């Protein structure tokens, strides 16, 4: 059996909270066309991401990448600021 690794997902979003130690909350928005109404709908979701150096603040545009589970809710790591 081959060991083929799947590529990790990368998302872009805005930091909306950096109050916790080594964790930021990132809001990721996506747009899609509604299948029935044919109107573009904007949906957002919040992710808890690991920030090991506590250097990101509210309002920063960041990229997050999928990783192993770090805690109960954290499975994303901040990789860079846009």
Curated annotation (Swiss-Prot):
InterPro entries: NA-bd_OB-fold (IPR012340), Ribosomal_uS17 (IPR000266), Ribosomal_uS17_bact/chlr (IPR019984), Ribosomal_uS17_CS (IPR019979). Keywords: Ribonucleoprotein, Ribosomal protein, RNA-binding, rRNA-binding. Signal peptide: none annotated. GO terms for cellular component: cytosolic small ribosomal subunit. GO terms for biological process: translation. The keyword rRNA-binding applies. Transmembrane segments: none annotated. CDD domains: Ribosomal_uS17. It comes from the Bacteria. It holds the Pfam family Ribosomal_S17. GO terms for molecular function: rRNA binding; structural constituent of ribosome. One of the primary rRNA binding proteins, it binds specifically to the 5'-end of 16S ribosomal RNA. Part of the 30S ribosomal subunit. Belongs to the universal ribosomal protein uS17 family. This is Small ribosomal subunit protein uS17.
